[in-house]
Protein backbone atom coordinates (compact mmCIF):
# COMPACT_ATOMS: atom_id res chain seq x y z
CA UNK A 1 0.00 0.00 0.00
CA UNK A 2 1.29 3.47 -0.87
CA UNK A 3 0.10 6.71 0.69
CA UNK A 4 1.31 10.03 -0.69
CA UNK A 5 0.51 13.17 1.28
CA UNK A 6 1.30 16.72 0.18
CA UNK A 7 4.10 15.65 -2.16
CA UNK A 8 5.85 18.55 -3.87
CA UNK A 9 9.06 18.80 -5.85
CA UNK A 10 10.84 21.92 -7.04
CA UNK A 11 14.01 22.52 -8.97
CA UNK A 12 14.98 25.99 -7.82
CA UNK A 13 12.00 28.25 -8.56
CA UNK A 14 10.41 25.69 -10.91
CA UNK A 15 7.77 23.68 -9.03
CA UNK A 16 7.15 20.53 -11.08
CA UNK A 17 4.95 18.67 -8.58
CA UNK A 18 2.53 20.50 -6.32
CA UNK A 19 0.85 19.01 -3.26
CA UNK A 20 -0.09 15.53 -4.57
CA UNK A 21 -2.24 13.33 -2.33
CA UNK A 22 -2.75 9.73 -3.45
CA UNK A 23 -3.57 6.30 -2.06
CA UNK A 24 -2.68 3.15 -3.99
CA UNK A 25 -4.13 -0.08 -2.62
CA UNK A 26 -2.35 -3.45 -2.95
CA UNK A 27 -2.96 -4.87 -6.43
CA UNK A 28 -4.42 -1.62 -7.72
CA UNK A 29 -3.31 -0.53 -11.19
CA UNK A 30 -2.58 3.17 -11.59
CA UNK A 31 -1.89 5.07 -14.79
CA UNK A 32 -0.15 8.42 -14.67
CA UNK A 33 -0.74 10.41 -17.84
CA UNK A 34 -0.04 13.96 -18.90
CA UNK A 35 1.78 16.05 -21.43
CA UNK A 36 5.54 16.08 -21.78
CA UNK A 37 7.13 18.02 -18.94
CA UNK A 38 4.15 17.75 -16.60
CA UNK A 39 6.08 15.93 -13.84
CA UNK A 40 5.04 12.30 -14.43
CA UNK A 41 8.57 10.89 -14.36
CA UNK A 42 9.58 13.15 -11.49
CA UNK A 43 6.59 11.91 -9.47
CA UNK A 44 7.52 8.27 -10.11
CA UNK A 45 11.16 8.96 -9.24
CA UNK A 46 10.01 10.60 -5.99
CA UNK A 47 7.95 7.51 -5.10
CA UNK A 48 11.11 5.44 -4.72
CA UNK A 49 13.34 8.35 -3.69
CA UNK A 50 15.44 8.45 -6.83
CA UNK A 51 14.47 12.12 -6.50
CA UNK A 52 14.16 13.66 -3.05
CA UNK A 53 10.77 15.40 -2.67
CA UNK A 54 10.90 19.05 -1.61
CA UNK A 55 8.04 18.44 0.82
CA UNK A 56 5.39 15.90 1.73
CA UNK A 57 5.50 12.30 2.84
CA UNK A 58 5.36 8.87 1.24
CA UNK A 59 4.33 5.78 3.19
CA UNK A 60 5.06 2.40 1.62
CA UNK A 61 3.78 -0.75 3.31
CA UNK A 62 3.34 1.09 6.62
CA UNK A 63 6.77 2.73 6.65
CA UNK A 64 7.39 6.40 5.97
CA UNK A 65 10.11 6.24 3.35
CA UNK A 66 10.66 10.00 3.37
CA UNK A 67 11.89 9.71 6.96
CA UNK A 68 15.68 10.24 6.85
CA UNK A 69 16.10 7.24 9.18
CA UNK A 70 14.34 4.88 6.74
CA UNK A 71 16.56 2.27 5.09
CA UNK A 72 15.63 3.06 1.50
CA UNK A 73 17.77 0.26 0.08
CA UNK A 74 15.88 -2.31 2.17
CA UNK A 75 12.54 -0.72 1.21
CA UNK A 76 13.45 -0.79 -2.49
CA UNK A 77 13.92 -4.56 -2.24
CA UNK A 78 10.12 -4.74 -1.94
CA UNK A 79 9.33 -2.20 -4.67
CA UNK A 80 9.23 -2.66 -8.38
CA UNK A 81 9.79 -0.05 -11.04
CA UNK A 82 10.21 -0.15 -14.78
CA UNK A 83 12.25 2.79 -15.98
CA UNK A 84 11.12 4.96 -18.86
CA UNK A 85 14.27 4.06 -20.77
CA UNK A 86 15.53 0.63 -19.88
CA UNK A 87 17.95 -1.62 -21.66
CA UNK A 88 19.15 -5.16 -21.29
CA UNK A 89 22.83 -5.93 -20.88
CA UNK A 90 24.05 -7.02 -24.33
CA UNK A 91 26.84 -9.12 -22.84
CA UNK A 92 24.39 -11.23 -20.78
CA UNK A 93 21.98 -13.93 -21.86
CA UNK A 94 18.23 -13.48 -21.52
CA UNK A 95 18.32 -15.72 -18.45
CA UNK A 96 21.16 -13.72 -16.88
CA UNK A 97 19.36 -10.41 -17.52
CA UNK A 98 16.22 -11.72 -15.81
CA UNK A 99 18.03 -13.19 -12.81
CA UNK A 100 20.52 -10.37 -12.22
CA UNK A 101 18.44 -8.27 -9.80
CA UNK A 102 17.02 -11.03 -7.57
CA UNK A 103 20.48 -12.58 -7.21
CA UNK A 104 22.34 -9.28 -6.61
CA UNK A 105 19.73 -8.11 -4.08
CA UNK A 106 19.90 -11.53 -2.39
CA UNK A 107 16.17 -12.00 -2.81
CA UNK A 108 16.73 -15.46 -4.32
CA UNK A 109 19.54 -17.92 -4.72
CA UNK A 110 20.86 -18.38 -8.24
CA UNK A 111 19.02 -21.70 -8.50
CA UNK A 112 15.71 -20.16 -7.32
CA UNK A 113 16.08 -17.15 -9.63
CA UNK A 114 16.81 -19.33 -12.64
CA UNK A 115 13.83 -21.58 -11.91
CA UNK A 116 11.54 -18.54 -11.59
CA UNK A 117 12.98 -16.96 -14.74
CA UNK A 118 12.36 -20.14 -16.71
CA UNK A 119 8.81 -20.31 -15.36
CA UNK A 120 8.19 -16.73 -16.52
CA UNK A 121 9.79 -17.31 -19.92
CA UNK A 122 7.60 -20.38 -20.38
CA UNK A 123 4.50 -18.28 -19.61
CA UNK A 124 5.26 -16.15 -22.66
CA UNK A 125 6.54 -19.02 -24.82
CA UNK A 126 10.13 -17.78 -24.79
CA UNK A 127 11.89 -20.47 -22.76
CA UNK A 128 13.92 -21.46 -25.83
CA UNK A 129 15.48 -17.95 -25.78
CA UNK A 130 16.94 -18.31 -22.27
CA UNK A 131 20.50 -18.75 -23.51
CA UNK A 132 20.24 -16.15 -26.30
Question: Each PLM stretch: what is its role?
Answer:
Residues 92-101:
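Short coil-to-helix segment of the ABC ATPase nucleotide-binding domain corresponding to the Q-loop/switch region
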Residues 65-80, 110-111:
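ABC ATPase NBD coupling module
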Residues 48:
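Helix-to-loop junction immediately C-terminal to a conserved catalytic motif
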Residues 33-35:
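The feature captures the beta-strand-to-loop junction immediately N-terminal to the Walker
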Residues 14-15, 73, 128:
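Short coil-to-beta microelement around the adenine-binding A-loop and adjacent beta1/P-loop entry
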Residues 56-67:
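Conserved ABC transporter NBD signature motif
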Residues 63-64, 99, 110-129:
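Conserved ABC ATPase "signature" region
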